[in-house]
Amino acid sequence: MALWPPLNSGMLVRTGHTVLTWGITLVLFLHDTELRQWEEQGELLLPLTFLLLVLSSLLLYLAVSLMDPGYVTTQPQPQGEPKEEQAAMVPQAVPLRRCRHCLVLQPLRARHCRDCRRCVRRYDHHCPWMENCVGERNHPLFVAYLALQLVVLLWGLCLAWSGLQFFQPWGLWLRSTGLLFTTFLLLSFFALVVALLLASHLYLVARNTTTWEFISSHRIAYLRQRTSNPFDRGPTRNLAHFFCGWPSGPWETLSAEEEEEGSSQVV
């Protein structure tokens, strides 16, 4: 019998993120940065604003990592024949597939995540830093988190730079500024990664596609026979639908509408 309960990987990742976030913030306050100078001069507006942004980014991170990303639930089959409007919403050209892992009927754009062991609607990817999937329900919050986190990282980068002192003997510099310089390098790396992630996700959202669809379109049944994205309604409408709330309608319906528009243009 185990003396300790098994460690939850999600709890470890979230605890590590929280400790790292407040640890970096503490370093910026303890060293001779603009943040500390503002505090000593009694100018508390900017330090409090920075702390509020850090706290907001942390709460948003926890919200995205803990919320349901859009798991596909088992729904009972309706009694008798389906209603006419329900049948029209799922055309025969786009049959629903049963997941061979969890045995649920997968809506269009859903995928089974082996890490979460669940099917996720409009699956984008499984984020190891969140220890959660990014899907239909939490993808907008995920992009908002990336934007806010980038602001915090860039501001923290400027604050760390303001406290670096280069004109000192090597030994003295290492003792007084070594930890701050390490923090500066960490912030630089994280800012670059988050900026690239934010840019790529905004690009994909503007095209109404997901990371999984973008990378694996040649293997996805509803995309490999097409020359264009059946869900793309133009950048403005795609962004509006994404940030103003899901769902914008069953994806099967949008796919069918795209086919009808294409056939009418040919005629």
UniProtKB/Swiss-Prot annotation:
The subcellular location is: Golgi apparatus membrane; Endoplasmic reticulum membrane
Q: Where are the transmembrane segments?
A: 10-30, 44-64, 141-161, 179-199
* Record-linked PROSITE patterns: DHHC
Q: Which residues lie on this side of the membrane: Cytoplasmic?
A: 1-9, 65-140, 200-267
- Please tell me which top-level EC class this enzyme sits in: transferase
* EC number from the UniProt entry: 2.3.1.225
Q: GO MF terms on file?
A: protein-cysteine S-palmitoyltransferase activity
Please state the protein's primary subcellular location: Golgi
Q: Which InterPro entries match?
A: Palmitoyltrfase_DHHC, PFA4/ZDH16/20/ERF2-like
GO CC list: dendritic spine; endoplasmic reticulum membrane; Golgi apparatus; Golgi membrane
Q: Which residues form the signal peptide?
A: none
Q: Which Pfam families match?
A: DHHC
Q: Which residues lie on this side of the membrane: Lumenal?
A: 31-43, 162-178
Give UniProt keywords alphabetically.
Acyltransferase, Endoplasmic reticulum, Golgi apparatus, Lipoprotein, Membrane, Palmitate, Transferase, Transmembrane, Transmembrane helix
Its recorded reaction(s) are:
L-cysteinyl-[protein] + hexadecanoyl-CoA = S-hexadecanoyl-L-cysteinyl-[protein] + CoA
PANTHER family from the entry? PALMITOYLTRANSFERASE ZDHHC12, ZINC FINGER DHHC DOMAIN CONTAINING PROTEIN
**What does this protein do, in the record's words?**
Palmitoyltransferase that catalyzes the addition of palmitate onto various protein substrates. Has a palmitoyltransferase activity toward gephyrin/GPHN, regulating its clustering at synapses and its function in gamma-aminobutyric acid receptor clustering. Thereby, indirectly regulates GABAergic synaptic transmission. Negatively regulates NLRP3-driven inflammation. Catalyzes NLRP3 palmitoylation, leading to its degradation via the chaperone-mediated autophagy (CMA) process.
Name of the protein this chain belongs to: Palmitoyltransferase ZDHHC12
GN (gene name): Zdhhc12
